[in-house]
Structures are given as structure tokens and as C-alpha cells.
């Protein structure tokens, strides 16, 4: 086992324990503060990742030039700032707090473990089977890894029912399996979304905060796309 993999596993376990503690014991106000801090870190990493784009944005903007807002690059690069600010500092915190406190802790943990297992499945299948690349956006992603993600995403609901965990009413049925597969799909698309911007800016990672992983965005890229989408699903009563 490589030292890099050991660091990756160790960091993941520490991060998981901290996350579980905060989810279970933080009250809503402190939880909101914590999620806001997470959002700020993600926003900063987003800006750092898009450094080349942001430099171009600066060049395209001149507050004293009347035609600054007619420059097509201004709108293109401003959208990078705007998306990051709105998504990480508004949409994400609202979604997380709603799912944790207005839906339930158990459901939030269910989502979290679907994403974790999906990520693990992608790594296990991709590393051991390999095969044809999934897309040029992320050369390390393989089709076998994607299949592994889908397969592993069903494990949480199977484990819940095998252990007959009390107070968790998530049955092993077609709808819940389909939901787990959908969450895995969104996780993978979220990963590819951020990989696209990293590749666009010749970046391997979004940061150096987490040993073995890179930045915080590298670790939770799928989850932070999943949560707002599930928030909308719950708001509209789809699931």
C-alpha cells in the first residue's frame, strides 16, 4: 500500500469522524456557522482553481472604461465569480441545513454514505479493472469505475436493511434503489463538473487542505452537487 493511499485513507477517516460528530451533536445555529465556513473554503478554492479565468476577468474589466460591460469576456468571467458566490455561500448552506434539520439526520446520513460508497466503488473498480476512459475531461475516470460507483451506491440501503437499524425507515425497494443510483449519477457528474474547471486551468487539485486528497472541493465535489438537488426534490415532494 503506497504512502499516498495511506494518507488518503487516514484523512478520509478523520474527516468522516469529524463530520459525523458535527452532524449528530451541533445545534442548528452552530451547524449553520460551520457550514458557512465550509462554503467560504469551497468558494476560495473555486476562485483559486479558476485563477487563469479570474486573471482574464481582471484584464477584461476596467471600471473607468465605458464599454467595460460590453466586453463579452466580462460577462463570461463574471459568471465564474457569481456562480461560486451564490452556490457556495447561499445555495449550499441553505440546502444542507434544511436536509439536516427539516428532513432528518438519518436521511442526511443516508445521502452521505451513498456518496461515500459511490466514490469508493469508483476507486476500487477503476483501480483494479481499469479499461476504457470515461471522458477526456477527467482522464483518470474509467467506465468500469463508473459502473463500480453505481454498484457500491446500493450498499448503504442493503446494509441498513440487513442490520435492521432501528428508527431508520428506508426500505430495500425499487424506488429507493433507483434513488441511490440517481444520487451516484449526480455524484459522478459533480466530480466531472469540477474536473472540467481543473483541467481548463491546468490544475490537478483545488487546494492542499486535505493530505492525500488535495482541496476540500476535491473531497466533497460530488456531495455538494447532490445536496442542493435533493433539497429541490424534497421541497417539491418528488421523493
Residue ranges, per PLM feature:
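Juxtamembrane boundary at the C-terminal end of a transmembrane helix
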Residues: 232-239
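Membrane-embedded alpha-helical bundles of polytopic integral membrane proteins
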Residues: 1-181, 185
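Hydrophobic alpha-helical transmembrane segments of integral membrane proteins
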Residues: 89-90, 207, 224-225
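Interfacial loop-to-transmembrane junctions
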Residues: 199-222
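Short glycine/threonine-rich catalytic loop with a Thr-x-Gly-x-Asp
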Residues: 144, 188, 216-220
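Juxtamembrane interface at the ends
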Residues: 122, 128, 195-203
Amino acid at each position: 500500500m503506497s504512502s499516498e493511499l495511506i494518507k488518503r485513507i487516514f484523512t478520509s477517516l478523520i474527516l468522516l469522524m469529524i463530520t459525523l460528530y458535527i452532524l449528530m451533536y451541533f445545534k442548528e445555529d452552530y451547524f449553520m456557522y460551520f457550514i458557512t465556513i465550509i462554503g467560504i473554503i469551497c468558494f476560495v478554492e473555486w476562485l483559486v482553481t479558476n485563477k487563469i479565468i479570474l486573471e482574464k476577468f481582471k484584464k477584461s474589466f476596467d471600471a473607468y472604461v465605458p464599454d467595460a460591460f460590453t466586453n463579452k469576456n466580462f460577462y463570461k468571467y463574471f459568471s465564474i465569480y457569481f456562480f461560486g458566490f451564490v452556490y457556495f455561500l447561499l445555495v449550499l448552506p441553505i440546502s444542507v441545513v434544511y436536509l439536516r434539520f427539516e428532513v432528518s439526520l438519518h436521511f442526511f446520513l443516508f445521502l452521505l454514505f451513498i456518496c461515500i460508497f459511490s466514490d469508493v466503488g469508483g476507486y476500487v473498480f477503476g483501480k483494479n479493472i481499469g479499461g476504457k476512459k470515461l471522458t477526456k475531461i477527467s482522464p483518470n475516470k474509467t467506465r468500469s469505475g463508473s459502473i463500480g460507483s453505481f454498484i457500491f451506491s446500493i450498499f448503504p440501503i442493503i446494509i441498513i436493511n440487513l442490520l435492521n437499524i432501528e428508527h431508520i425507515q428506508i426500505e430495500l425497494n425499487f424506488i429507493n434503489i433507483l434513488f441511490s443510483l440517481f444520487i451516484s449519477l449526480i455524484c459522478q457528474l459533480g466530480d466531472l463538473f469540477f474536473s472540467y474547471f481543473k483541467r481548463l486551468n491546468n490544475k490537478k487539485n483545488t487546494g492542499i487542505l486535505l493530505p492525500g486528497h488535495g482541496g476540500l472541493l476535491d473531497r466533497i465535489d460530488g456531495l455538494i452537487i447532490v445536496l442542493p438537488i435533493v433539497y429541490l426534490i424534497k421541497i417539491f415532494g418528488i421523493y
